[in-house]
Regions:
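Charged, amphipathic alpha-helical regulatory modules used
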Residues: 1-119
Length: 119
């Protein structure tokens, strides 16, 4: 049996594919339904907004690697996880987004590198 996701993990699972402001209403509907069906707690707009700000910040940092001080440069012909200072990114986002639990930041940063940079 798979581990049960936390509230913030479920929110990030929906928001990670929200790329345009027009998708916000769809994401909100999905979030309300998922949180209700999985009995993770009531919909909390303040938490959702904090996680959304974190997600957009991560996406912006990884989406423009040339401008990022955490992008260490390509070491080979292809993009790789080693092109990033993952620990530095984690520390940066932990200090910048204290409302988002540190454990959630720790797992999401490498996933975001895969999702927004490697794919």
């Amino acid at each position: 049996m798979a581990e049960r996701r936390t509230y913030v993990e479920e929110v990030l699972a929906v928001l990670q594919y929200e790329f345009r402001p027009e998708q916000r209403a769809t994401s909100e509907r999905k979030l309300k339904r998922r949180l209700r069906e999985k009995k993770l707690g009531p919909y909390d707009q303040a938490v959702i907004d904090a996680v959304r700000a974190f997600k957009y910040d991560v996406q912006a940092e990884i989406g423009y690697p040339v401008d990022s001080c955490f992008h260490t440069g390509s070491k080979g012909r292809f993009a790789a996880m080693d092109d990033w200072d993952v620990d530095g990114l984690r520390k940066h986002f932990r200090s910048r987004h204290p409302d988002v639990p540190g454990d959630e930041i720790d797992w999401f940063v490498p996933w975001a590198i895969y999702l927004y940079y490697l794919r």
